[in-house]
Amino acid sequence: PVDPDRRHAGFSQFIVPTDLPGISISSIVLMSGEHHFNEVTFDEVFIEDDNVLGEIGAGWQQVTAELSFERSGPERILTTAPLLTALIRVLAEQHDADDHTAAALGDLLARLISLRQLSVSVARALADGHSPVNEAALVKDLGTRFEQESVELAADLFSYVDTQTPGYDRVAALLEVGRLHSPLFTLRGGTNEVLRGVVARGMGLR
């Protein structure tokens, strides 16, 4: 039974075979036309006791521990790395990048390196058997905002590039993909608003 004073107590995890009666799976197609996510609905689905994963009643703790692996991975900060790399090469071809452009790119790359270090530190803590829930949430919050802002900056800088510059078409294609995926960055794996709540709770602020 759920303890009213401990609202997360009593949850358990189950392994759910997707071919069970009552399970319906519908594709969620992205704006880019790609398919990475599904909507799953359950209608009177029965799960055997043998399908319990881990400890009965410890589902919430297990899920939050698992999410530390998901939220802190390098994919949370490196989605736009191919775009940034291609853009830097194109700008270098022009040989006329001003101080503002150089400073903007330098700031972005410094943030990327810092985020990578933060991601690696969380991975190290996980490997040592710790559960850095707050740190992992912070990596995803900062990382996904970095990804969105890097697309915006890339679009701004790219607007000044001559269409005849070598590599122009590749950057244009990567930028188009980045624009379509950008809204998704702060949604997948938990919205940033939820993540900030996790961090605030971990710091004793709520």
Question: Predicted segments — roles?
Answer:
Residues 1-24:
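A short core secondary-structure module
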Residues 2-4, 20-21, 30, 47, ...:
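Short, glycine-/Ser/Thr-/acidic-enriched flexible segments
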Residues 6-10, 34, 54, 191:
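Short glycine/proline-enriched turns and hinge-like loops at secondary-structure junctions
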Residues 8, 31, 57, 127, ...:
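Short glycine/serine/threonine-biased micro-segments
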Residues 12, 21, 38-43, 183:
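Structural beta-strand/beta-sheet cores of well-ordered domains, especially the beta-sheet scaffolds
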Residues 26, 31, 36-99, 120:
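A glycine-rich, basic-preceded beta-loop-alpha segment at the flavin cofactor/substrate interface
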Residues 68-206:
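Alpha-helical interface subdomain recognition
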